[in-house]
Amino acid sequence: PFFLFLSFLEPHFQNCFDDFPAPDIYKNIPAGYMPPDLGSLKGTAWEHLSGYYGMVKRLDEALGRIRDALKSLGMEENTILVFSTDHGCHFKTRNKEYKRSCHESSIRIPLAFYGGPFTGAGKLREKVSLVDLAPTLLDACGIPVPADMQGRSIMPWVRRETTTPSGKDIFVQISESQVGRAIRTDRWKYSVEALDKDPIQDAGSPEYTETFLYDLEHDPYELHNLIHSKAHEKVCEVLAEKLKRCMTEAGEPAPVIHPASKENMGQLLVFEGEENL
């Protein structure tokens, strides 16, 4: 048995030119179409999306070469392939960089399995976190999952042993652009930030301030921040407690979470596409 982890440079921009040709079926799309969450906000998507699609095409070609190699070695039938990534890209629409925010374009990522027990085509309607990958692969290989391992196996849903959604919430930790934490439920996105901490030097904080609340059911593109809405104060209270539980389960101390205030309102709202922080 073997375990091989391959990380590709694409779709990072390794030079200053968008010289990756987009796939034929995509290359004309940016001229007349832009995903609503990107097109509604300021950013660099109109300039870079075509080249980004071209780099995604390179990844697809690289995955094809891996499959060809497994076939030539006679190993494809006994190998599980997993395709995923660590984050998405929001093209400077949410902050002054391309990632590291609580928004779907940054945290919602592809995850595909092929081979072994992952037979047939299908889509799993279950929220999955990257910490679920290790227990899932162990379970798929018939190896007992250690009781103290973070995450949970999704194999019961893959094997159709259950079809009931777990109701699990996704916990997000953000660094380098901010000392931030967030939680994503089926309907809500709730994010907090340690406004006085250095995101390069500080890994966490005993205190955070609310920054974002999105109703994903009615606002899937996250264009309306409800964090200052009086009508949603109870929602914030419930989500704050859920977030604290996620943090303690991850080994962090339970923090104090301060409500978003009028004093820092300008600081909190600039993320809706503004580039001057």
Explain the meaning of each model-derived region.
Residues L239, L243-I257, G266-E272:
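C-terminal helix-rich "cap/oligomerization" subdomain common to oxidoreductases
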Residues P1-L130, A140-D148, P199, G204-E207, ...:
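Active-site-proximal cap/lid insertion segments
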Residues E77-T79, A121-I183, H232, E237, ...:
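Polar, surface-exposed loop/tail segments
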Residues F8-F13, H87-H90, E97, F118-T119, ...:
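Short, solvent-exposed loop/turn segments at secondary-structure junctions
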